[in-house]
Amino acid sequence: RYIEARPSKFALDVAFNPKTTEWQLSYDGRKNEPVTLPMKFPLLLAQGAEGIAVGLSTKILPHNFNELIDAAVKYLRGKRFELYPDFQTGGMLDSTDYEQGKRGGRVKVRAHIEELDKKTLVIRSVPYGVTTTQLMESIVKANDQGKIKIKKVTDNTAAAVEVQVDLATGVSSDITIDALYKFTDCEVSLSPNACVIVEQRPQFLSVQELLKQSVDHTKDLLDNELRIRQAELLEKWHYSSLEKIFFEEKIYKELEKKHEDWEKVIKAIDSAFDPFKKKLKRAITREDILKLTEKPVRRIYRLDIAELDAQIKQLEAELKQVKHDLDNLVDYTVAYYENLQKKYGKGRERKTELKQFEVIQAKQVAIVNAEPYVK
């Protein structure tokens, strides 16, 4: 399928730069499309990913936006960092056996369950990957199997998750909460498996290694952007300097002289620049001279030396800043991440609470009951 998309403001900041993007013709040959996007953010870790192929599978859990940026800055500063999953669905997470997302690791995720009163429980969040429908079905199933004892379960979810569980008479709410975690989808176990393609080969990495690769890639992309910017500024400085000399030294008058042919005019202009060539940052080309001669004479006479001087000074200041950024690329990359956090980090605080769960014994919480009513 062919998919077109409009990038968001965030995507324009982190995933799109026409000057550093490799392009190819679209399926019908009418437009260009990116081969890959120059991603300057650990999007794979932020959004998570899951997939399966022949003999391989991957499951990368999502992580918190701000924590990823904090970790990136720590890595750039040579400090230790740790990363733990964070889910938009909230809930609680036991990351004791996370193993930084590598094969063999495991995390437990729980819903938030509140005691509304002695006879009523309210589930305020669902574990990652579980819907309220699945959650309710698992509760009914546990009740049918005699593992919990409830009267009914009701889905009052609107903007926020709210699943109400009405308990049977004489049933302990504390024991029921433990039983819900033990026998229903109020608690699920997830097994991460960070398998990614690196240099055309599948590799099993930790989330720390993934972040390091992303940060190194981002730094390289920023370096490339700075060098492109530097080249553009140098070109502008070169032409502005040529314009100033062309006007200030009255080299344009060569256009008024009678020469045998156009080539002689170009050669005469080039020779007139000889005393000033050492001041320039690159050689004068034929294209430079042609560009100068294409300017209408009336515009040449209107050139303002003071304005050209101001342009050149501004370009020199920008070149100085770009050189400083290239010489201090780590600081520049840190500033890039901090700017992202300032622009987009608000409202992206951690939603999943990190906790260490107590082991629940099945025999201590199983209850024989009657059939519930589901609404």
Task: Name these PLM-found stretches.
Residues 2-5, 9-10, 14, 18-19, ...:
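C-terminal interaction appendages of subunits in large macromolecular complexes
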Residues 20-32:
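Helix-hairpin-helix/helix-loop-helix acidic hairpins
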